[in-house]
Amino acid sequence: MSLKYDPDDSLFNASWATVLLSERDVAGQIPINFVTTSAISLRAACFGDNKFGRIAAEKCLSNLLAVGYRRFNIDLYWSPELSRWILCPVSIPEGLDVVKTSAEATPTATAEIAEGTVIAQPDESSGELLYDLGPYKCSNSLDLQDLLNVFLDYFKYTDTDLVIYTKFLSLNLHAAADPTSIDEPASNVPSEQLPVESNRVSSILEGYLGSYIYGPSNLLKDRRNLNDSWYVVDDGYKPIIEYFTIEENFEGIQSTPDGWPSMKYIQLAAERRLLVEYGSVDPQLGNYDLSVENEVIFPPGYLTSTIPVAAADDGSLDSGCLYDPDTTDISRINASWAMSNHIPIPRNLSNESFRYISDLVVNLTACGMTSTLNETLFGHTADVTPDPYRNLTLSSSWAWALGQPAAPVSDLDSAESDEKRCAIMDLSLDGHWRTANCSETRRAACRVDNQPFRWALSSEPLSYEDAYNDACPPTTEFSVPRTGLENTYLSRHLLSQSPDLIDPTSSEPLKHEIWIDFNSLDTETCWVAGGSHATCPYTSDPDKLQRRTVLVTAVAGIVICIIAALTLFVKCNANRRNSRRNKRVIQGWEYEGVPS
């Protein structure tokens, strides 16, 4: 029976839907190589106890997808005996006798099993039969196809604009160990025992997820002629060109040697959901030719740039941060596909230990890096204890302060009210965002020459609407940070201003609150850039307002608080009469923000 996307029901909570959707959308035109996310090792999160069962793997991967992990490092083992890519590090032999014992089998009884047999016991939690292979307990059927079935079901389950997120796979290829010599390195796999065409990783991926994959061939074709690729789509899907190099030939055709498409281009224009690269490849598989798979899978390390990082005891970074106070030139800031090399995990689960990890992930994201979890959290895998994993991935949220965006507190007609419908950067909250009344007067954040990291502060305080039209001087425009690193550059620029203008410790809001171009005036909880007349993209097309169940369950699955003390709440009143309030709401649901 094929595995499915089947996360724990307890993970579903819609309170963070606005946060995740708004961050996805504000970064929607940034080339994907500059957008940070959260990465995780499947080996650590799902098999840290050395148990490789199908039932547990289905639940674990489903939970990780549900709580918002978008990049997965996966270890695959080629078993010549089985002619399959398996998840267990040891090949399960087909020619040996299988001795089934109960879970209560004594060590003496086990020791009496004759050599040349394999012991199998039912797993205590799932009842699935697992084979004892040295330090490992493995299902005889957990393989690459099983994982891809979970991804396939997930993609089908989240197929509306509101809940689409691009995923990334980094595949590490190994040779499975011989079950008769588990403690020894795997032998070299001769050419005749390597995968045939139908068993190559690219062939399997193409067969299961081909319609979702954006591969090297797609990138090469798009880069060669931007006039016929990234430039011919909706303006809102085009990548921000200041992030990459553009060349033009004598015919006026533009190309790029280093550009990447934006998330909106991949998801909405190209209708793709997945990018795959090879990570490491064991020398025992040295004859496995990766070059023939370049249609589907990127070469080793193509989607990864590992940044060495040193962290202090409080979770701040001693070294490795990509913010450079001496330059705003993006060509000198190597943030493309930037990944942290390690997240140190304390042994014991406590409020203090989790706060340290959370603070570290927050700082890595602010410094322009994707955080990578390569260890099992506090000794518990995500199929059994998913809470720490969901808390950690939400720590990579970079924009809103805790409890934000706050919902309007008034029962008046919020369709005509500007209460809590515009965003400010609050320097008293470490540069995170919160909501404010749009009629309040503040200075505005002005982007210089459309450059990602160059900012100016407007001279006069104005309302949000007036700020969009009149605040910013020539060669600048009212704007909003679109990534964690852009946000850091803006907040650091503001902090460099005279204390007469900016003072995070001041009780005067004018000195620590700055307008950014982000509002939900058109549709409550639908946050958009473009001034007070910008419209919500999810209410203009009836086709985008289908499948409310998907919105409530799939989006909600990537939701929880960053710290244990935060209480989550979502208010749904689908039957509210609209005689007094003509409020427009995404998908008919009233997302009231994240309570503080």
Residue ranges, per PLM feature:
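Residues within well-ordered beta-strands of beta-sheet-rich folds
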Residues: 73, 168-172, 445-447, 517
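Long, acidic (Asp/Glu-rich), low-complexity accessory segments flanking structured domains
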Residues: 1-71, 78-202, 263, 269, ...
